[in-house]
Curated annotation (Swiss-Prot):
It comes from Methylorubrum extorquens (strain PA1) (Methylobacterium extorquens). One of its GO terms (biological process) is tRNA threonylcarbamoyladenosine modification. InterPro entries: ATPase_NBD, Gcp-like_dom, KAE1/TsaD, TsaD. The gene is tsaD. Keywords: Acyltransferase, Cytoplasm, Iron, Metal-binding, Transferase, tRNA processing. Binds 1 Fe(2+) ion per subunit. This is tRNA N6-adenosine threonylcarbamoyltransferase. Fe cation binds at H115, H119, D309. HAMAP family: TsaD. It catalyses: L-threonylcarbamoyladenylate + adenosine(37) in tRNA = N(6)-L-threonylcarbamoyladenosine(37) in tRNA + AMP + H(+).
Length: 347
């Protein structure tokens, strides 16, 4: 079984081919990604119109390249998976219309994938992970703690009530005059900084629910930065280190709460998982690995190239759905907003 995956929900254009090996484990035959960082850097963030135009310009040839690298043809593909949301609606439409056209012309099943679900299922591609597991899904636009019980079966245990983790990193980077995207820049600066110089708050720590709030932390950092202006290079490094340390503490505490809630909705987790672009952050990965070890769980995070948006995760989610007979027709809509997990009942 070979699946073509197409991803255009934000500022990466991606196409990939994924198959099942003889051991029933996922295998990536091709994974092509074109980033738009250069196009958006001057604006300090993603400009939807520019993103959509860039997808149009490169998607067709990227799909062709993925098929070629995989040593296959559209005729040999068993299904066409596409991220149908959530995301920037212009980009989502471009990917979805392309996938619908290919499915119609080649007479292949169309598999409309939730972008967040694809992140959630990536550990099953990379590690063959069994259900159920606790997922921290953290990216520029989303921060959620989710009990992943099965394909299409998710229970949200916590979410952010304001900024997503990746969004907070990006805003801090912009405030400090760092480059775009902000997350890697803040992490790089933090390596040479003192995480104890600034006593920044740890919002929501100790709360019974597993929700996040980072706006107060971001505001506290801004106040410190304004007090120190003009900022020396060491000030910037120390602010980044202090901010990252605060985020790590919040994440670990929120995961601890979610682990307690997990048993009530899904039994015992097989692992603690991190996915999404923020899962590439080394400090967060190390802290989560330590937290998992304390409670006797393994910690799983995708390889760094699969933390950000990519076509392989879309193809894999499509493959998982196709094996269950979950096929979509050509009327499936593009969705700017598309929640993929139910809200857990209040304790």
């Amino acid at each position: 079984m070979k699946i073509l995956g197409i991803e255009t929900t934000c500022d990466e254009t991606a196409a990939a081919v994924v198959t099942l090996g003889e051991d029933e484990r996922g295998q990536i035959l091709a994974n092509e990604v074109l980033s738009q960082i250069a196009e958006h850097a001057a604006y300090g963030g993603v400009v939807p119109e520019i993103a959509a135009r860039a997808h149009v310009e490169v998607l067709d040839r990227l799909i062709a390249r993925a098929l070629q690298r995989a040593g296959t043809t559209l005729k040999e593909i068993d299904g066409i998976a596409v991220a149908a949301g959530p995301g920037l609606i212009g980009g989502v439409l471009i990917g979805l219309v392309t996938a619908k056209t290919l499915a119609l012309v080649a007479r292949k099943p169309l598999l409309a994938v939730n972008h967040l679900e694809a992140h959630a299922l990536t550990p099953r591609l990379t590690d063959g992970l069994a259900f159920p597991y606790l997922l921290l899904l953290a990216s520029g636009g989303h921060t959620q703690l989710v009990a992943v019980k099965g394909v299409g079966d998710y229970v949200r245990l916590g979410t952010t009530i304001d900024d997503a983790i990746g969004e907070a990193f990006d805003k801090v980077a912009k405030l400090l005059g760092l480059g775009y995207p902000g997350g890697p820049e803040v992490e790089r600066q933090a390596e040479s900084g003192n995480p104890e110089r600034f006593a920044l708050p740890r919002p929501m720590i100790g709360r019974r629910q597993a929700d996040f709030s980072l706006s107060g932390l971001k505001t506290a950092l801004r106040i410190e930065a304004e007090r120190l202006e003009p900022l020396a290079s060491q000030d910037v490094a120390d602010l980044c280190a202090s901010f990252q340390a605060a985020v790590v503490d919040v994440v670990v505490d929120r995961v601890r709460v979610a682990l307690r809630a997990f048993a009530g909705v899904a039994g015992h987790p097989t692992a603690l998982v991190a996915a999404g672009g923020v899962a590439a952050n080394g400090a967060i990965r190390r802290a989560l690995a330590a937290q998992a070890g304390e409670v006797g769980l393994s910690f799983v995070a995708p390889p760094l190239p699969l933390c950000g948006d990519n076509g392989a995760m879309i193809a894999w989610a499509g493959l998982e759905r196709l094996r269950l007979g979950l096929v979509d027709d050509l009327t499936v809509p593009a969705r700017a907003r598309w929640p993929f997990a139910e809200v857990a009942p209040a304790a």
